[in-house]
Amino acid sequence: MDLYPEENTQSEQSHNSENNMQIFKSENSDGFSSDLMISNDQLKNISKTQLTLEKEKIFKMPNVLSQVMKKAFSRKNEILYCVSTKELSVDIHDATGKVYLPLITKEEINKRLSSLKPEVRRTMSMVHLGAVKILLKAQFRNGIDTPIKIALIDDRINSRKDCLLGAAKGNLAYGKFMFTVYPKFGISLNTQRLNQTLSLIHDFENKNLMNKGDKVMTITYIVGYALTNSHHSIDYQSNATIELEDVFQEIGNVQQSEFCTIQNDECNWAIDIAQNKALLGAKTKSQIGNSLQIGNSASSSNTENELARVSQNIDLLKNKLKEICGE
C-alpha cells in the first residue's frame, strides 16, 4: 500500500513512493536536521507479537455471520518508523541547567503526518519512543577540565523522582561525550504536553569558561520513534535503560531508571530538574530549583578524587601525544 499522496515535494524532501520512504533534510546557520520515515510494509522482517481476540470463541454465531464479523472487525496495523537527527550549538548562558531542549515535538510529528494520505493519517494516534542517542562535543581545545551533567526527563510527570528517564555525568576535557537512553514507551498524539515528554537538561559546570554569547558546545541527537494507529503495535528490544558508549566509560557515569542496576560506583552527584524550565533559546526567569540527588550526597573528597583522576588521564593523554610526535 502506498502511504504517501502523489504530489510535488519541496527541495528539502526526498520522496520514494516505490519504497514507501521519505527523507527530510534542513541545514542553515542555526544547525542541521535530517529525518527518515519508512512504512511498515518495508519492514516485514521485524517480528511482532499479535494481540488478538477471537470473537467466534466468545459468541455462538453461524459460520456466515462469523465470517462477516471477522471481516468487519479486522484492522490493519499501520506503522511508520522515523529517525530524527538534529545538531545545534549551545550558548554557555543556556548551558546552566535552567532551560530544557525538547527532543521530539508535536510540530515535527505533524510535519511527518501531513505527508501521508488522509485515510492513513487520520488513523495515526500513538508515538512510540524507542531510543535517544546524544553526543556532546566541545567548542574549545582538549585538556580543559569541564564537567558536564545531563538528564533526560519526562516533564509531564509531576514527581521529580519518577520523571527521570536517564542521567549521565562526564567531562568534555577529551572533546566529546556520548550516551544513549531507551525510553521504550508509547504516548497518545493528543497528550497535552507532548513536547515535554523528552526534555533534555544540561548543566555545564565550568560557567566562567566563556561569556554570554559564546558557543561552548554542540549537541547532536538522534531520536528513533514510530507513529502507529495502536498502542499495541510495537515491541522493543531488551536494551538497558541508559548506556555510555564504551570509549567514554572512563570519564563518565550514568543513572538509570530506579528499577535498573547502576553499573558505576562513582555516582554521587545532583542535577536540577525542576519543572517548568524555559525552552532553550527563550528568555529565562528566576525559579526555585529542584535538584535530584544521584546516589548519596557527594563529599569533597569524592570531588577531589574525581578531579585527580581526570587530571591523571589528561597527563597520560599528553604523554601519548608526545610519544607520537617524537618529543
Swiss-Prot record:
InterPro entries for this protein: Caulimoviridae_Movement, Viral_movement
Function text: Transports viral genome to neighboring plant cells directly through plasmosdesmata, without any budding. The movement protein allows efficient cell to cell propagation, by bypassing the host cell wall barrier. Acts by forming tubules structures that increase the size exclusion limit (SEL) of plasmodesmata, thereby allowing viral ribonucleocapsids to spread directly to neighboring cells.
Assembly description: Homotrimer, through the coiled-coil domain. Interacts with VAP. May interact (via N-terminus) with host prenylated Rab acceptor protein 1D (PRA1D).
Location of the protein in the cell: Host cell junction, Host plasmodesma
One Pfam short name: MP
Protein name, per record: Movement protein
UniProt KW Transport keyword: yes
GO BP terms: transport of virus in host, cell to cell
Keywords: Coiled coil, Host cell junction, Host-virus interaction, Transport, Viral movement protein
A single Gene Ontology CC term: host cell plasmodesma
Organism: Cauliflower mosaic virus (strain W260) (CaMV)
Protein family per UniProt: Belongs to the caulimoviridae movement protein family.
Source species, domain of life: Viruses
Keyword Coiled coil applies: yes
Coiled coil: 297-327
